[in-house]
């Protein structure tokens, strides 16, 4: 079998195509890092749901999150989007730290803002974290409100979450943070 037989028709090996592929793989790696971040020792209730407990949205439909916790803390909300981009929804330039009280049902965004399902269609995941301290992380500029990126940004969020949860030596304290997630789909 010659090397040309290994290439699938329609997939080029140009520098541009390889660059796009590398970008996609980096974004997917970043999303996986945050998507896999879990606390197996979590002993308190913490939940994130979508408006109407829906998980599938058509383009242009409203998306709203509801977060509940059995413990006081600060909420971090990260969207691992349908295009592989990691977007930090909370905290952001407008809401620098989002405090939740035990038993409270937090709605985000509030009534003054609407999130809509946007292209590309596909699957995504929203991961919510609760920590005793707010995240110490560079936020987006006021013009941008939300900060987004790929692998480097995901690593930055992960490190900020570890610091906010607290460390015992090099290990993250397991009793100081929690996480919840919801998988969603955007359809055409």
Residues of each region from the PLM?
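Secretory-pathway glycoprotein ectodomains that are cysteine- and/or Ser/Thr/Pro-rich
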Residues: 4-188
